[in-house]
Amino acid sequence: MNTLYLGSGSPRRMEILTQLGYRVVKLPAGIDETVKAGETPAPYVQRMAEEKNQAALTLFCETNGAMPDFPLITADTCVFSDGIILGKPRSQAEAIEFLNRLSGKQHTVLTAVCIHYRGKTSSRVQTNRVVFKPLSSEEISAYVQSGEPMEKAGAYAVQGIGGIFIQSIEGSFSGIMGLPVYETVSMLQDLGYRPPLSALKP
């Protein structure tokens, strides 16, 4: 079974990679996720994914005294609406604010993936568009009380209860979850790491 290092504590990213047939070893490393002044969404998520990768790589080398034998994957997701980058809500009040902002409108979900393997590093940004139905204050309150919006970019989970708010998606469902499958496997192949199923060849 193919092995990957995942520089993330996200259970959703772990689930996606495991479902693809990889054996996943968690290697999360924390970084400062503050948005820089004037930073736009795509450069921001790409910088986050790359900085997470470097932090996880440094942690691995310090712990093991060598570079990892298998690919190290990191990713970052953000939601962009009305010119504002929405990360993970820091409180229930902020989650309510985010959901009110998304209600009845289209927003953009960007996920950046960064992979290091055998001395080479590759990163890519994948973009999706999501349309929310208009949300009532009662729906928002009940959803926030469920706890699901916390620790989720934009304060919702497309694969969870939050999916009932979504009218349409343009892009990748897995990308909105936090790790776009097509792009991730393509990047691994480009770096010389084959997917679990040998039938998946270019």
Curated annotation (Swiss-Prot):
Annotated catalytic residues: 76
Keyword terms, alphabetized: Cytoplasm, Hydrolase, Nucleotide metabolism
Tagged with keyword Cytoplasm: yes
Cofactor(s) needed by this chain: a divalent metal cation
Pfam families with a match to the protein in the record: Maf
UniProt GO BP: nucleotide metabolic process
Catalytic activity: dTTP + H2O = dTMP + diphosphate + H(+); UTP + H2O = UMP + diphosphate + H(+)
A single cellular component GO annotation: cytoplasm
Compartments where located: Cytoplasm
Site residues (Important for substrate specificity), renumbered to this chain: 12, 77, 159
Cited InterPro entries: ITPase-like_fam, Maf-like
Main EC class the enzyme belongs to: hydrolase
MF annotations from Gene Ontology: dTTP diphosphatase activity; UTP diphosphatase activity
EC number: 3.6.1.9
Function noted in UniProt: Nucleoside triphosphate pyrophosphatase that hydrolyzes dTTP and UTP. May have a dual role in cell division arrest and in preventing the incorporation of modified nucleotides into cellular nucleic acids.
Family: Belongs to the Maf family. YhdE subfamily.
Protein name: dTTP/UTP pyrophosphatase
Lineage: Bacteria, Pseudomonadati, Pseudomonadota, Betaproteobacteria, Neisseriales
